[in-house]
């Protein structure tokens, strides 16, 4: 490779013909993608390659597979809420979900695991999920994503599965049912799915919007305060 420290030429110059410009830019992008697929751009990290691949997945999940996949929200590996749960660790949870899905799924359903963004530098479950999916003969039905927009995934999922993550409450906010496999503050009768996991895959699911509004109003009024561990919040005094 030559001509650039990044392994590809700079953006093509703009000419007077708009159509030719567009074609030239698209050809440049295609050349870059080809180099990525061949592993010829070492300056691009694995994360960048994953992002390119996942953007294509999102279109399918929001169209063809909308409301036909179950979203599994993974938590950080050392989350105390995981350590104190009914699961030994996150891999144990992953195995439990894949086994149940393989036994009870309907035709045309998919399972999507979403990695926790704060766990990106510490864990990667690619090989585990691939091995379990192959072992249980659901290899073509299981996806593992890292960087896709969580609210979009929640809105288009048939249901969300969590150990006890607060993602479950976000799922309810977006109108998507939640199956909580351990204890969570929002796991109350009439709000979350009160079914064993094996029964979830074939059940008719819905969110009681009135119940959600009542629980949300109570938590805002009695239980929650504005704050963040990660950034300052204007007006919160933090």
Residue spans for each PLM region:
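Leloir-type glycosyltransferase catalytic cores
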Residues: 1-36, 190-238
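Short catalytic/ligand-binding loop motif for oxyanion handling, primarily in non-cytosolic enzymes
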Residues: 79-82, 119-122, 170, 187-190
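Active-site donor-nucleotide binding/catalytic segment of nucleotide-sugar enzymes
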Residues: 63-95, 99-102, 108, 115-119
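Short, glycine-/Ser/Thr-/acidic-enriched flexible segments
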Residues: 77, 118, 167, 185, ...
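A nucleotide-sugar donor-handling region in carbohydrate enzymes
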Residues: 1-80, 86
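Beta-sheet entry/capping signal
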Residues: 69-70, 108-110, 159-160, 177-178
């Amino acid at each position: 490779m030559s001509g650039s420290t990044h392994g590809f030429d700079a953006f093509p110059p703009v000419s007077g013909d708009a159509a030719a410009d567009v074609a030239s830019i698209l050809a440049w992008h295609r050349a870059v993608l080809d180099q990525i697929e061949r592993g010829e751009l070492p300056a691009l990290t694995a994360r960048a390659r994953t992002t390119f691949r996942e953007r294509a997945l999102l279109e399918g999940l929001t169209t063809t597979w909308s409301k036909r996949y179950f979203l599994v929200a993974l938590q950080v590996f050392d989350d105390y809420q995981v350590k104190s749960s009914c699961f030994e660790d996150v891999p144990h949870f992953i195995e439990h979900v894949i086994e149940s899905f393989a036994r009870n799924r309907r035709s045309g359903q998919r399972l999507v695991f979403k990695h926790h963004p704060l766990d990106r530098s510490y864990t990667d479950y690619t090989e585990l999920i691939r091995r379990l999916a192959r072992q249980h003969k659901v290899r073509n039905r299981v996806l593992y994503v890292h960087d896709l927009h969580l609210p979009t995934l929640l809105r288009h999922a048939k249901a969300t599965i969590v150990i006890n993550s607060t993602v479950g409450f976000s799922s309810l906010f977006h109108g998507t049912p939640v199956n909580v496999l351990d204890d969570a503050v929002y796991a109350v009768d009439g709000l979350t799915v009160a079914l064993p996991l094996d029964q979830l895959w074939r059940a008719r699911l819905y969110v009681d919007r009135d119940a959600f509004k009542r629980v949300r109003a109570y938590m805002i009024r009695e239980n929650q305060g504005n704050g963040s561990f990660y950034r300052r919040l204007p007006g919160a005094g933090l």
